[in-house]
Amino acid sequence: MGGGGQLGESGENGCKSAAGVYTWEEVQHHSNRNDQWLVIDRKVYNVTQWAKRHPGGFRVLNHYAGEDATEAFTAFHPDIKFVQKYMKPLLVGELAATEPSQDQDKNAALIQDFHTLRQQAESEGLFQARPLFFLLHLGHILLLEALALLMVWHWGTGWLQTLLCAVMLATAQSQAGWLQHDFGHLSVFKKSRWNHLVHKFVIGHLKGASANWWNHRHFQHHAKPNIFKKDPDINMVDLFVLGETQPVEYGIKKIKNMPYNHQHKYFFLVAPPLLIPVFYNYNIMMTMITRRDYVDLSWAMTFYIRYMLCYVPVYGLFGSLALMMFARFLESHWFVWVTQMSHLPMDIDNDKRRDWLSMQLQATCNIEKSFFNDWFSGHLNFQIEHHLFPRMPRHNYHLVAPQVQTLCEKHGIPYEVKTLWKGMVDVVRALKKSGDLWLDAYLHK
């Protein structure tokens, strides 16, 4: 799903029909890491070599190898015509006239209806951003950081001031997380290069993280949400079992890396407090170093240098590090609950190769709209709309939501909206249900 590449790969991979015309069966043979074909608008592309240079990461392309990637391609790329120019060297043919446009017996009527909805949203200007909206969000992040610093510089470093400072820093970090998400999805500026530049500033300078790390991880999540071996957000490194399939598989195989029937209890001790300050911090830094991503590493270092210059004079080195870790400890709770309540209680399974609309609705739910919920979640309380239209500016999610709901009702697809409290409670309930399934399979199967 990008541009540029090498021609001449197709002949070595076999299955080539006369005049570059292929059946779905032939395309599906090219579905491993060393041999990747995909279909976009009935045209067949060999992306085996290009995958290594794909700006969104090689894994995203691999996840769609042997499949129709039209809907994902459209969802992720803001300038389709521009990208298509660079795809020409990758073209190896097209589908035979007798072949359907969709693979895996997908519902053509549903796909067409969703395509019509996307076109309608574009014609209504729902993919156009309001710069002032994002400027104000950036402004309130910078204001929170400035107030936190001024407070301890002026009133000292007592326990109350330190606690308030940590809360303000955690709030700024959380809101910066939602803001970098906007730029990372290319949903603010018309030019991708400006989105990329500001993304590096927000995630690098304001948060000390890596834009490339986020891109390669997050686009996989959007491409195949809640799908094992494809969505990194559900790779729980054997700490948890999720959904209804994995627990039974682990139970039957007698895998007991953790007491999974108690995972809904130890979740509170592991995921919310440790995800950002421990796992993400380590993973991000190691990724930048091992991949020699010196650009992102330089951006991240500006965050740490700025932070130390601001806080070491008042807290000392150890105190400054402790304050940073405590702020990230608070931020981690915020981040985990917001992100998990929209996904973890939903369907988590192996890849069923569904159409875009069905796949996203199986994996996502919404949280009720309110001023607080919008701000608290970075408008990801409209997780359904965000997953269907990842490039849409978040201030327009609520405008397209009624049309999405109508389309779902037409095709009998559940469209779930919860209260904030129920969304959080359902995370724990889902973990308990999966843990119980594991225990039953472990003991009786």
UniProtKB/Swiss-Prot annotation:
Alphabetized InterPro entries for the sequence: Cyt_B5-like_heme/steroid-bd, Cyt_B5-like_heme/steroid_sf, FA_desaturase_dom, Fatty_acid_desaturase
Subcellular location: Membrane
Broad class of where this protein is predominantly found: membrane
Pathway given in the UniProt record: Lipid metabolism; polyunsaturated fatty acid biosynthesis
Stored PROSITE patterns: CYTOCHROME_B5_2
Any Gene Ontology CC annotation: membrane
SUPFAM superfamilies: Cytochrome b5-like heme/steroid binding domain
Entry GO MF terms: acyl-CoA (8-3)-desaturase activity
Any single biological process term in GO: unsaturated fatty acid biosynthetic process
Pfam short name (any one): FA_desaturase
CDD domains linked: Delta6-FADS-like
Membrane-spanning ranges: 132-152, 153-173, 266-286, 307-327
Gene3D superfamilies from the UniProt entry: Cytochrome b5-like heme/steroid binding domain
Membrane topology designation: Multi-pass membrane protein
Location of the Cytochrome b5 heme-binding domain: 19-96
Function: Fatty acid desaturase with bifunctional delta-4 and delta-5 activities. Component of a lipid metabolic pathway that catalyzes the biosynthesis of polyunsaturated fatty acids (PUFA) with preference toward n-3 substrates and Delta(4)function.
Family: Belongs to the fatty acid desaturase type 1 family.
Record comment regarding domains: The protein sequence includes a number of characteristic features of microsomal fatty acid desaturases including three histidine boxes and an N-terminal cytochrome b5 domain containing the heme-binding motif.
Protein name: Acyl-CoA Delta-4 desaturase
Species per Swiss-Prot/TrEMBL record: Siganus canaliculatus (White-spotted spinefoot)
Top-level taxonomy: Eukaryota, Metazoa, Chordata, Craniata, Vertebrata
